[in-house]
Amino acid sequence: MTTKAEGEKLLYCSFCGKSQHEVRKLIAGPSVFICDECVDLCNDIIREEVQEADGLKPKSGKLPTPKEICAILDQYVIGQTQAKKNLAVAVYNHYKRLEQGGQKDDVEIAKSNILVIGPTGSGKTLLAQTLARLLDVPFVMADATTLTEAGYVGEDVENIMQKLLQKCDYDVEKAQRGIVYIDEIDKISRKSDNPSITRDVSGEGVQQALLKLIEGTVASVPPQGGRKHPNQEFVQLDTTNILFICGGAFDGLEKIIRRRSEKGGIGFGAEVKSKEDARAIGEVLRDVEPEDLIKFGLIPEFVGRLPAIATLESLDEDALVTILVEPKNALTKQYIKLFKMEGVDLEFREAALRMIAKKALERKTGARGLRSIMEHALLEIMYDLPSIPNLRKVVVDEGVIKGDSPPILIYADEPRLETAS
């Protein structure tokens, strides 16, 4: 017969410390116990990690189709229909490939990284950022002009992976399914398409260093942004499933394409083309071939790692005006909201929008230059705005953008129009 002391010996959960009377079930193992509450907690943690590893799909849980991706891109980026289609298909196929990655099959689908070619301010970066936001995946940008080969002064290519890890709070699983956008990729072209015996640490050397990273390798990244040194444990990051999007303006590439197409026209059946090809640069860039990129200065192996090519066209005046008013985060909407915070309405007349677009075209800055033009034009009224009593509305016309006249001010207690002094 057991004594009372032995019969009342309490057992405790080895994880949370609760007694057997405080929980519904206590599961025994070799010298350890776990309660039903801790089992539920462990299940929740594992389920969350599995969902995150799977979590390339947007928050709805379903990967959007190329048409749905294009429709969302249309809300933020004006025009560039063909480029959007190219990007939507490439991104959809990439993440579809990752969805099926766990299935055993004899056919392995290779990764298709993307090259985006287009003039400054045409929307290359915005497209990549919008895609990452839509798919709810980590996104990081890198500038190719700051990269050098490992061992030289400057950033080495593994710094890109370090930025990606930092973006995910060093969650390796999450980082391994992110998007990396490398801008100014055309600036690391070698000086000629002939191999050189001299060292080119910021051109061909960087292309060579990026090769393995883009194709898929296990990169050793210093923990928590530290510098590499011996006897240090590195974070191992597999880049196989990271989508790389490389973008650049590729100034002069259209001349290489035109020269190639002129050489191709030989014989009676050939299409006759004038020396001065009247086609727009964007239209010419659509005909780009890998050989043109190699002539430009990208090494053949690097071109081969970027099979999906999307070309963007220069934005004309109409497109720039549309960019000012239509997208969800259009500049005019941003300034209207800013003025509304002061209790004042802001109106842009059509002529003012046209003048902003013309100035951006003159500066050859594309959509990127629109904000600086508006900021300069509205500086004086934004300076005075909090100090003007009873102001109801500000009207911006062409003269304000030109700098010839102040904006029209409409006061709450006066129906007539006045101008800022």
Curated annotation (Swiss-Prot):
Entry's Gene Ontology cellular component terms: HslUV protease complex
Pfam families: AAA_2 (PF07724), ClpB_D2-small (PF10431), zf-C4_ClpX (PF06689)
Positions bound to Zn(2+): 13, 16, 35, 38
Keyword hit for S-adenosyl-L-methionine: no
Record's keyword terms, sorted: ATP-binding, Chaperone, Metal-binding, Nucleotide-binding, Zinc
Residues annotated as domain ClpX-type ZB: 1-54
UniProt record, GO biological process: cell division; proteolysis involved in protein catabolic process
Molecular function, one GO term: protein dimerization activity
Keyword Zinc among UniProt keywords: yes
Cysteine pairings via disulfide bonds: none
UniProt cross-references to InterPro entries, sorted A to Z: AAA+_ATPase, ATP-dep_Clp_protease_ClpX, ATPase_AAA_core, Clp_ATPase_C, Clp_protease_ATP-bd_su_ClpX, ClpX_bact, P-loop_NTPase, Znf_CppX_C4
Source superkingdom: Bacteria
Residue sites binding ATP per the record: 119-126
PROSITE patterns: CLPX_ZB
Subunit structure and binding partners: Component of the ClpX-ClpP complex. Forms a hexameric ring that, in the presence of ATP, binds to fourteen ClpP subunits assembled into a disk-like structure with a central cavity, resembling the structure of eukaryotic proteasomes.
Family per record: Belongs to the ClpX chaperone family.
UniProt function note: ATP-dependent specificity component of the Clp protease. It directs the protease to specific substrates. Can perform chaperone functions in the absence of ClpP.
Name this polypeptide is given: ATP-dependent Clp protease ATP-binding subunit ClpX
